[in-house]
Amino acid sequence: MLFYFELVVILLCTKLAGDISVRLGQPSVLGKLIVGIIIGPAVLGIINSSELIDELSEIGVLLLMFMAGLETDLEELNRNLKSSFAVAAGGIIFPFIGGYVTGLLFGLIQSHAIFLGLLLCATSVSITVQTLRDLGKMNTRESTTILGAAVFDDVIVVILLAFVMSFLGTQDVNITLVIVKKIIFFVSIVFIAWKVVPWIMKMLVPLRVTEALISAALIICFSFSYYSEMMGIAGIIGAFAAGIAISQTEYKHEVEHKIEPIAYAIFVPVFFVSIGMEITFQGIGSQLWFIIIMTLIAIFTKLIGSGLGARLTGFNLQSSISIGAGMVSRGEVALIIAANGLTANLLAKENFTAIVIVVILTTIITPPLLKKYFV
């Protein structure tokens, strides 16, 4: 029964907060993120994390990235692969150096400083996607480059994580297996998207049941996400790939039209609130300067690194800054890496709490940055 009450509070508060945010000239997602902090454990404590909320949140982010895939122009994505790789590379090199040096300056041991640098390399564009949708900028060269860069970033960071945990952590990681799995994933996903997805859609859509088309689309979305997770890649990459696959079929516009109400009615609002709920202010007094400095390093190294990658591949200064801003959010990807670091003794418990706050702050700052720089 408590869950029903929590759901009422989440849906009501996110809609009101989103409206207030828009009235104040900001993307609606900013208000939804802030309301998660307010109604979560950090302030009012009305909503607490639970397995049900976590699961709804996971579905929310998958549907968000699925819709991003549906809206992505595949030809534009292919044209901007070079730029996407440069943006991802800059967004990994600069944050790694910044995080590593900052860790050493705060007295962290070598292995912990290296892991801290790796943690700042992560990028999660789910908040960026929502903000760009709010701004009506999803079908631009800049947004396509950001999405492509996020895929490169995820793969490179996962491989680097395997290296770091193998050499510095307590876990035994087979690096060759990690790399081979990534190659198998991308080769197989291209084949499945090209050959299997159209066949599945044609088989399931004619079924004489209610909303067979949407059920077929969701089956593909969640299957891709499951396969992605199974191969050691974030589920959001699989959902994004599923969206691109369906966007190449005749069903693209109908799926897009019908999925959006399902996603935004319940799942996506829960996802935004769940991010804000991760913040806790307990015991942060001793970590305050660490949090402030790390947040600034996290923001500016992505902004400069990814922005430089865009600038070097032909974007003008304004577009380069907007692309850098789109890569700032660390989101759920960094939280997963941080949890792995805690388990492998590569991240101290007090630093883990601080990093969670840093990750949330980078996520909250992303919508206003995009609003300011995305023309």
From Swiss-Prot:
Protein name: Probable Na(+)/H(+) antiporter GerT
Lineage: Bacteria, Bacillati, Bacillota, Bacilli, Bacillales
Listed GO CC annotations: membrane
GO molecular function: antiporter activity; monoatomic cation transmembrane transporter activity
Topology relative to the membrane: Multi-pass membrane protein
Signal peptide region: none
UniProt cross-references to InterPro entries, sorted A to Z: Cation/H_exchanger_TM, K/H_exchanger, Na+/solute_symporter_sf
Keyword terms, alphabetized: Antiport, Ion transport, Membrane, Sodium, Sodium transport, Transmembrane, Transmembrane helix, Transport
Localization: Membrane
Function of the protein: Contributes to the success of spore outgrowth from the germinated state during alkaline or Na(+) stress. Does not have a significant role in germination.
Positions of transmembrane segments: 27-47, 89-109, 112-132, 145-165, 183-203, 204-224, 226-246, 261-281, 288-308, 350-370
Family statement drawn from the similarity comment of this UniProt entry: Belongs to the monovalent cation:proton antiporter 2 (CPA2) transporter (TC 2.A.37) family.
Species the sequence originates in: Bacillus cereus
GO biological process: proton transmembrane transport; sodium ion transport
